[in-house]
């Protein structure tokens, strides 16, 4: 089977770096899909739908490729949180998150243009947050990192200091579950090692 190019339909530097770390050099094509069009209350369905819409938006740019779309949200106390709109929202969220836990959902959509197949799945990881002082919350938000991330934290950045533990897939919290990607590729007839560079 011919190995197609791997396209990441995401502007997320964390997802790109994660793939590069494990030997996959993706072609990056950020999706311009308007996420506000999708309003779903169930986090797993929301992230799967958004991931698929992102991948489908990028797919027409290619004739033969694997197009990977992803989307992440943090579900906490029955509410769904994407990226905070501003510093005030990030501070308010961290005042609730600190000392608490939430479930980080990431939707994964992989379109195989050659086989005309799409596989869409989600992964969830429980994240336990540390107790934090107001000073620590303000300092963390001042780094700007929480404004760029679903759930207002990055486990691979400054936010790692404030994550006590996780239950589930670590790479999922970064924004792309590597074990789930391996399973999806296998379902399409590929071995993940085919994409190593």
From Swiss-Prot:
Enzyme Commission number: 3.6.1.9
Source species, domain of life: Bacteria
Catalytic site positions: 71 (proton acceptor)
InterPro entries, sorted: ITPase-like_fam, Maf-like
Gene3D superfamilies: 3.90.950.10
Cellular component annotations (GO), alphabetically ordered: cytoplasm
Recorded GO MF terms: nucleoside triphosphate diphosphatase activity
Cofactor dependence: a divalent metal cation
Compartment(s) where it occurs, according to its Swiss-Prot or TrEMBL record: Cytoplasm
Principal location: cytoplasm
Catalytic activity: a ribonucleoside 5'-triphosphate + H2O = a ribonucleoside 5'-phosphate + diphosphate + H(+); a 2'-deoxyribonucleoside 5'-triphosphate + H2O = a 2'-deoxyribonucleoside 5'-phosphate + diphosphate + H(+)
Keywords per UniProt: Cytoplasm, Hydrolase, Nucleotide metabolism
GO biological process: nucleotide metabolic process
Functional summary from the UniProt entry: Nucleoside triphosphate pyrophosphatase. May have a dual role in cell division arrest and in preventing the incorporation of modified nucleotides into cellular nucleic acids.
UniProt record similarity statement: Belongs to the Maf family.
Entries under HAMAP family matching the protein: Maf
Protein name in the entry: Nucleoside triphosphate pyrophosphatase
Organism: Nostoc punctiforme (strain ATCC 29133 / PCC 73102)
């Amino acid at each position: 089977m011919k190995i197609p190019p791997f396209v990441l339909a995401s502007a997320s530097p964390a997802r790109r770096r994660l793939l590069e770390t494990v030997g996959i050099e993706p072609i990056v094509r950020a999706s311009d899909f308007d996420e506000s069009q999708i309003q779903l209350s169930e986090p797993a369905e929301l992230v799967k739908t958004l991931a698929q819409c992102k991948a489908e938006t990028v797919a027409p740019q290619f004739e033969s490729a694997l197009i990977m779309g992803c989307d992440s949200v943090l579900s906490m106390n029955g509410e769904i949180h994407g990226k905070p709109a501003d510093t005030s929202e990030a501070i308010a969220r961290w005042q609730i998150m600190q000392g608490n836990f939430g479930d980080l959902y990431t939707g994964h959509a992989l379109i195989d243009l050659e086989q005309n197949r799409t596989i869409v799945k989600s992964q969830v990881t429980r994240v336990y947050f540390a107790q934090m002082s107001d000073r620590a919350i303000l300092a963390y938000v001042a780094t700007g990192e929480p404004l760029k991330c679903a759930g207002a934290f990055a486990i691979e950045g400054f936010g790692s200091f404030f994550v006590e533990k996780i239950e589930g897939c670590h790479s999922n919290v970064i924004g792309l579950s590597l074990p789930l990607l391996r399973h999806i590729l296998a379902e399409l007839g590929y071995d993940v090692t085919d994409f190593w560079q």
